[in-house]
């Protein structure tokens, strides 16, 4: 997809952009590179649920973000880093004010930070009219995080390598009950743990899709975090359930919204969650399409 259009940069107009969650429907770790990065085979699917970024482009050079993340400087914020990376790649010196309505938990395995970075790249490329295509934006995003490219490209995908080799996929669009145990898990803590499985055999996509979906991180996460173990055990009483990413979120899959809502109502006091639908086209792409048609 090409983002080129005939628009001039769009200043001082509030625009709203979705920043959806993702699930890893399966996640296998097949090796580790000399630089420490892990080789993966994973299946990404988006959810129709996530944060919202309200972005106003400006003709000043300032990039401002509200609210700030406690303990994180503006320059270390992934949203700021994405905006600055786009400026570095294109030479533009335009600015933006970005408001974030944050509902995705940090340390949950839903890709919230990566999704925020991707939405920033896609939105500002449109608002600033920097004319990069999605492949180039994905390349910029990869330097910000391994999960950023899938959010930029906007389609559910089978991913290999460190997550950057993406093959479009169309898993069934099921309903999910996503729960968040009361713990935040840093990805680096799981991927550096000596007991993490790192030698799962590589398989063809056909074989993976036909098999039982699992997550190689789940065993060690459940051992290290009893809250996650308790959540998985509770959900398994009702439906197939597993960890997404490195956690801490755990999801159960259902064939209908009614089934998922019924179990949501049964959640114990110690577990919080939400119901969302798996979607194979990111809500971000629909929003970009609507904006882009204004500039044909």
UniProtKB/Swiss-Prot annotation:
GO terms assigned for molecular function:
4-(cytidine 5'-diphospho)-2-C-methyl-D-erythritol kinase activity; ATP binding
Q: Which residues bind ATP?
A: 105-115
**Which pathway does the database say it acts in?**
Isoprenoid biosynthesis; isopentenyl diphosphate biosynthesis via DXP pathway; isopentenyl diphosphate from 1-deoxy-D-xylulose 5-phosphate: step 3/6
Please give the biological process terms from Gene Ontology that the record holds.
Answer: isopentenyl diphosphate biosynthetic process, methylerythritol 4-phosphate pathway; terpenoid biosynthetic process
- Which Pfam families does the UniProt entry name for this protein? GHMP_kinases_C (PF08544), GHMP_kinases_N (PF00288)
E.C. code: 2.7.1.148
Record: active site: 22, 147
* Record field: transmembrane: none
Keyword annotations for this protein, in alphabetical order, are: ATP-binding, Isoprene biosynthesis, Kinase, Nucleotide-binding, Transferase
Catalytic activity reported: 4-CDP-2-C-methyl-D-erythritol + ATP = 4-CDP-2-C-methyl-D-erythritol 2-phosphate + ADP + H(+)
Q: What class of enzyme is it?
A: transferase
User: Function of this protein?
Assistant: Catalyzes the phosphorylation of the position 2 hydroxy group of 4-diphosphocytidyl-2C-methyl-D-erythritol.
Q: What protein name applies here?
A: 4-diphosphocytidyl-2-C-methyl-D-erythritol kinase
Q: What taxonomic lineage is listed for the species of origin? A: Bacteria, Pseudomonadati, Pseudomonadota, Gammaproteobacteria, Vibrionales
